[in-house]
From Swiss-Prot:
Gene name in the database record: aflY
GO molecular function term, any single one: oxidoreductase activity
Family annotation (Pfam families): Questin_oxidase
Function: Oxidoreductase; part of the gene cluster that mediates the biosynthesis of aflatoxins, a group of polyketide-derived furanocoumarins, and part of the most toxic and carcinogenic compounds among the known mycotoxins. The four major aflatoxins produced by A.parasiticus are aflatoxin B1 (AFB1), aflatoxin B2 (AFB2), aflatoxin G1 (AFG1) and aflatoxin G2 (AFG2).
BP GO terms, sorted: aflatoxin biosynthetic process
UniProt-annotated stretches for the region Disordered: 1-22
Name under which the protein is recorded: Oxidoreductase AflY
Annotated keywords: Oxidoreductase
Length: 495
């Protein structure tokens, strides 16, 4: 994604014809853009179908599919993940067709709006305005075409001025979706996705600054403490009576900003300060492995002792965002200090997510003692199940992230902060697919009024959105979070 390559800045290279990635076009390649974590034998026909589907998503749909609640459009995430997992064109097409009925059509304003975005004041005033999303996309496409991906990402995220600090905080908002967008752009080397990432970032609120910059200020005033493992910090938060009780069942979907930070920000900051990343290649590698390890461990171990297994929907985003950091830490055009800062912010965001879940007690035996329904199968079978599973893409993203974690964490196995062994990642992958595939059991599906309200079904939202709510537990450490899940003894043999 060099800033001087013809495929990134300026006009497309005529020698390459239509098969190139530009600010206006997606083009994947089995040889050049398979992704950091991928299966073998990727095919050109799948690359072309994935490219076409992501382009279709861009031309038709908004980054959100619900402007009021803020539900995200995951089609590009889904398709790109399926591409890396070796999906066939038909499998990717099926995923796209399954998800398109509940998307929000994108829209554009008068071309003059795009021109106005060049005015810094108008640019700032438009932040958070969903109606300007398409205009921000066009603005950033033009920026990338003129300057190159690296320069534009630096100028709008890493420059260090007031605007970029604001946008950088927004990058960590919305269950980390803007950060995930950035990860896809970098891992799959698509300038087009970089423009969409920046536009999506502009749509999100800046509330992460409340704890991210405040923690940096705390460290600046009090000195850098000795860095502790994320899981040790999480346990300290669970034992903190203010932090552990800061959220409750009455809090809404955006309980990080609306509940946790309002009630426990002062108490949270010292805990967050214990996650430190040194600007060295060794610490970048170790802490990248640690955020993968910790998020995978919490996803698998944050269970209810008397309920069937389920992964927490909010926490799984920490895992599916961590999958991109092996790529991010290798972007040498980003200063090593900034890469360390991004990783630090990611670890601290994961800790905030854990606190927002209600600091759930972790049960490692639910991982080590788990008996998969298809115990004799390995990664290839789990991947195949994820490729054909009909959802909005979260299941296959979790599976790919667990594959990545198994690989990246292996050099640190057995060290402090790394409780999972190599085989445990596959076990959690089995747990993931077993839990979401239970949707086929009629005894599992409990379409309660609470679920309908959460999914906005009452005002015309598609029924698949409420189905998404049923696949995963939410805010798993709070009272009532598991009420709609069967007890362990209720599970039918066929489930």
């Amino acid at each position: 994604m060099g800033s001087h390559a013809p495929a990134v800045a300026g006009k497309p290279d005529p020698k390459k014809g239509p098969y190139q990635a530009t600010p206006w076009n997606i083009q994947l390649s089995a040889t050049d853009t398979p992704g950091f974590t991928h299966v073998g034998n990727l095919e050109r026909r799948s690359a072309d179908r994935a490219s076409d589907l992501v382009m279709n998503n861009h031309s038709k749909f908004h980054t959100f599919h619900d402007e009021i609640v803020g539900f995200h459009n995951h089609i590009s995430h889904h398709v790109l993940t399926l591409w890396a997992l070796g999906a066939t064109p038909d499998e990717m097409q099926a995923a796209y067709d399954f998800n398109k009925p509940f998307q929000l059509l994108t829209y554009y304003n008068d071309p003059s709006v795009n021109i106005k975005l060049r005015d810094p004041e108008f640019f700032r005033q438009g932040l958070g305005n969903f109606e300007l999303y398409g205009d921000y996309v066009r603005f950033f496409q033009a920026e990338v075409a003129a300057k190159g991906t690296q320069t534009v990402l630096h100028d709008y995220l890493f420059k260090g001025d007031t605007l970029t600090e604001d946008l950088l905080a927004r990058l960590f908002s919305g269950f980390l979706h803007p950060l995930i967008n950035l990860g896809f752009a970098l891992e799959f080397q698509q300038p087009f996705l970089a423009a969409e990432c920046l536009a999506s970032t502009c749509m999100h609120p800046p509330y992460p600054a409340e704890f991210l910059t405040a923690t940096e200020q705390h460290v600046e005033c009090n000195g850098r403490p000795r860095s502790l493992p994320i899981l040790s910090i999480a346990e300290g938060m669970r034992l903190d009576p203010v932090v552990a009780t800061a959220v409750g069942p009455e809090d809404g979907n955006n309980r990080i900003a609306d509940a946790l930070l309002k009630r426990a920000l002062k108490e949270l900051i010292p805990h967050l300060s214990y996650f430190q990343v040194e600007p060295t290649e060794h610490d970048l590698a170790r802490k990248t492995a640690e955020i993968l390890q910790a998020s995978a461990y919490i996803c698998g171990a944050a269970q209810h002792p008397r309920k069937v297994e389920a992964l927490d929907f909010v926490m799984l985003h920490s895992l599916t965002a961590a999958v991109f950091f092996p790529t991010i830490i290798k972007q040498e055009w980003i200063s090593i200090e900034t890469r360390a800062r991004l990783l630090e912010w990611k670890g601290r965001s994961d800790l905030i997510t854990y606190a927002a879940l209600g600091c759930p007690k972790l049960y490692p035996d639910r991982i080590t003692g788990y008996q998969p329904k298809q115990a004799a199968t390995g990664w290839s079978d789990v991947v195949q199940r994820a490729r054909v599973y009909q959802d909005d893409g979260h299941a296959c993203k979790v599976i790919r992230a667990l594959m990545c974690a198994e690989n990246v964490c292996q050099p640190f196995e057995g060290e402090e902060g790394f409780p999972l062994k190599k085989a445990d990642f596959l076990t959690v992958a089995h747990m993931t697919m077993d839990s979401v595939e239970r949707m086929s059991d009629p005894n599992w599906v409990r379409q309660t009024e609470k679920v309908k309200q959460m999914s906005a079904q009452g005002r015309g939202q598609h029924s698949q959105v409420s189905a998404i709510m049923l696949r995963w537990v939410r805010w798993c450490g709070t009272e009532g979070a598991w009420d709609d899940f069967p007890d362990l003894e209720e599970l039918s043999p066929s489930a």
